[in-house]
Amino acid sequence: MRNISAQAITDAVARLCIEANTRLPQDVQAALDKARQEEPWPLAKNTLDLLWSNLSAAREKDLPICQDTGMACVFVELGTDVHIDGSFEAAIHEGVRRGYTDGYLRMSIVADPLRRGNTGDNTPAAITVHLVDGDGCTITVAPKGFGSENMSRIQMLKPADGVEGFRKFVLETVQLAGSNPCPPSVLGIGVGGSFDKVAYLAKKALLRPLDVPNPDPYYAGLERELLTAINELGIGPQGFGGQTTCLGLAIEQMPTHVAGLPVAVNVSCHVTRRASATL
């Protein structure tokens, strides 16, 4: 059994909140850079160049890439041989509180969805814990802005809808979103499971690097097909047209009921943020 202090968790989460909001993951940066090099439409290319300049300025000045510094979605892979010395969830919330305060990040969380009222410290975080073998603890902070989150959709398709219904739903989601999610977008797509699980799969898919395909060749092929089809829609960066509507997408799948075909699309913008640390 290995002990990890609650303070170590707080320190890691605070650091990751700032890092994720000021520096994009290398795979997202590479996809954005590739897109601006290859985009043929002048207005779209100029827009991508501006996004790249903004990204560079944020990195150089340690400033947020986007004014919407997001809801702190925290994913933890916790070894079953780990003992936390203190309150685990309280340590995460305190890390978010400290990171958003020390990093001068926008406080975007309301205490109640209907009665509202800003909590003033961007807590509580949305915490997901996955138990794994061993004595490790890996924490990923993925701040999620709601311009793109609000464009996300879930649908309980019929089994008869099949792969064509699946494709149609994904493309329809991108078309309905238009310029609202600040494209070029990144898509996390879930298929299978239940109503709640498919939404989780879509969110989980956003954690996979854009240069890592689904290990199942069938779904890896679907990822390539969908990316091509989405970029042929012509929405383009910020809705100005062009061939760069989506930087990348990932599909996560799981078994489902014989009577169902759940599908969820979690839409993210070009500022798809995540930062990880292993304790």
Please provide the spans of the model-predicted regions.
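Non-transmembrane, aqueous-exposed alpha-helical and coiled segments at domain scale
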Residues: 1-189, 194-279
